[in-house]
Amino acid sequence: YGGDAVFLLAAVLDTKQLHDLAEEATSLGLESVVEVRTEDEIEALDMSAMDIISINNRNPDSFETDIYTSVRLKKFVPNDKIIVSECGIETGKDIDLLMSHGIHAFVVGEPLLRVEEPGRALAELLHSVEGVRSRR
């Protein structure tokens, strides 16, 4: 019945709120996942209490996705943070590209929701990721 992490949105919370909530999460034994969409949001963060930075690839104005958002924004995140890429990840090639740029984890949703057998689709997606196949 416990949680492992809290999900904090940089677009909604100010810098002090983000820092205070991340510190409180740490004091409770929780990880902090902070979602960012822009360079400005990243630069405003005090990342000392933040463990995981999740880069949202969806443009909030147009709702279009571009996985290169993660590639562009990763360079503004310290190397000691875990980086997650979310939205717009459709194929194993997308994951391979992101992995080649040092992205650690991925949120894949829409491609699994559009099919009748999401478990099978996930297995096929993972099988198509070169980085996953080479670890076996």
Give short role names for the model-derived ranges.
Residues E24-T26, M50-I53, V71-R72, H101-G102, ...:
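Short, hinge-like loop/turn segments at secondary-structure boundaries
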Residues G3-D4, L28-L30, A49-D51, N79-K81, ...:
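Short, well-ordered coil/turn segments that N-cap beta-strands
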Residues L73-F76, M99, L112-R136:
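C-terminal helical cap(s) of enzyme catalytic domains, especially alpha/beta-barrels
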Residues L13-E23, S27, R37-S48, P60-D80, ...:
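Short loop-to-alpha-helix "cap/lid" segments that border enzyme active sites
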Residues Y1-Q17, S54-F63, H101-L122:
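Glycine-rich phosphate-binding active-site loops on the catalytic face of alpha/beta enzymes
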Residues Y1-L8, K74, P78, I83-S85:
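Long, low-complexity, intrinsically disordered polar/charged segments
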Residues S32-V36:
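Long, charge-dense, solvent-exposed interaction surfaces that engage phosphate-rich ligands
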Residues Y1-G2, R37-A49, S85-V108, R120, ...:
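Catalytic cores of alpha/beta
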